[in-house]
């Protein structure tokens, strides 16, 4: 299959990691699909993505990935079928290295087998992380390898490359065939993290575009400090470098709704994928209002995929920069962000 429009605009959906980390199961994913179908689908959200720690710690005797039998006792395909029955798309996670960041089997040297497995299960989206990557193989080769495998698996699968902005990813990622690429470390649910990631994009506005979008990481809108991911402070290989500080996470604390609104608007005008990270089963009215703002989403989903303009000016009495992002569209209409 070859959907020539796959990745035309940034994907919109939900990912399990920010709130649930490894605490995922069949019931949770089905409930998330129910919530998206009833509360978010009409706004354009369509992907339900399972992140790390969904599999057993070992492959089977044939080298195939095996779903965790406690978390997904019926396997993955029935979950994917349920998501599809809601008119949504289903996503999963793997890693370019020998293991995932959580210590489960990675896809290194299993790329084509795993791509076929994902296709058999009905996967529509693959997040592909960067932990435990062999030092002797450039990331560019590993992402091209999985991209080739996905393009030959018999199913259209959105390919999300997640190497945290390492290895000059801007220079080669489009040629790899990835539909989106992470250009930052992991976001955390606090204003300092949001601000740091947003400011890190100054000068990088030109790199994303149709069919290869600059991913500034998932949204934390609506989390309000509700997360299970303190474990990332672990010093396991590959894990301790993915927090946005490059070291360990700052203490989680949540944001105000105004800060979340700013966060959502910034991610939208910078054409980042809009992948929700909160518990969408329990959104507050304010959270839903932010995440379904049709004017903000229209900017993000504009098929021209124009990047924002960054305006910097020395105009403060304390001699520091004022930084502003603006986004121009073909027609002049006021939008409340």
Residues of each region from the PLM?
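Glycan-recognition surfaces
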Residues: 110, 158-279
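Mature N-terminal, pre-catalytic/accessory segment of carbohydrate-active enzymes
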Residues: 1-12, 17
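Active-site-adjacent beta->alpha loops and helix N-cap segments on the catalytic face
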Residues: 76, 136-146
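Structural recognition of the beta-strand scaffold that forms the well-ordered cores
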Residues: 11-16, 46-50, 90-93, 124-129, ...
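Aromatic-lined carbohydrate-binding/catalytic grooves of carbohydrate-active enzymes
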Residues: 32, 36-135
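Aromatic-lined carbohydrate-recognition surfaces of secreted/lumenal glycan-active proteins
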Residues: 89-103, 152-168
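Catalytic cores of secreted or luminal carbohydrate-active enzymes
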Residues: 265-313
């Amino acid at each position: 299959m070859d959907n020539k429009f796959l990745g035309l605009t940034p994907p919109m959906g939900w990912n399990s990691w920010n709130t649930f980390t490894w605490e995922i199961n069949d019931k949770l994913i089905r409930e998330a699909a129910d919530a998206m179908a009833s509360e978010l689908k009409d706004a354009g959200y369509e992907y339900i993505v399972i992140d790390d720690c969904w599999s057993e710690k070992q492959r089977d005797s044939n080298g195939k990935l095996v779903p965790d039998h406690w978390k997904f006792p019926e396997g993955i395909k029935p979950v994917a079928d349920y998501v599809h029955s809601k008119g949504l798309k289903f996503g999963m996670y793997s890693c370019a290295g020998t293991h995932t960041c959580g210590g489960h089997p990675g896809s290194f040297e299993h790329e084509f087998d795993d791509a076929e497995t994902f296709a058999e299960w009905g996967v529509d989206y693959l997040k592909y992380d960067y932990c435990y990557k062999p030092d002797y193989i450039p990331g560019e080769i590993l992402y091209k390898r999985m991209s080739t495998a996905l393009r030959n698996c018999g199913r259209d699968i959105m390919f999300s490359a997640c190497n945290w902005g390492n290895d000059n990813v801007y220079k080669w990622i489009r040629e790899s065939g990835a539909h989106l690429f992470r250009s930052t470390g992991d976001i955390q649910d606090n204003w300092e993290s949001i601000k740091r990631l947003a400011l890190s994009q100054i000068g990088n506005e030109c790199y994303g575009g149709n069919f290869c979008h600059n991913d500034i990481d998932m949204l934390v809108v609506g989390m309000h400090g509700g997360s299970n991911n303190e474990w990332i402070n672990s010093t396991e290989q590959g894990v301790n470098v993915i927090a946005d500080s490059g070291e360990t996470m700052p203490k989680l604390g949540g944001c105000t709704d105004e800060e979340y609104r700013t966060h959502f608007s910034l991610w939208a005008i910078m054409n980042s994928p809009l992948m929700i990270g909160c518990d969408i089963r329990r959104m507050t009215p304010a959270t839903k209002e932010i995440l379904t703002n049709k004017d903000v989403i229209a900017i993000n989903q504009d098929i021209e995929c124009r990047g924002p303009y960054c305006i910097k000016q020395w105009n403060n009495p304390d001699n520091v920069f004022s930084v502003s992002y603006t986004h121009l569209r073909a027609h002049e209409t006021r939008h409340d962000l």
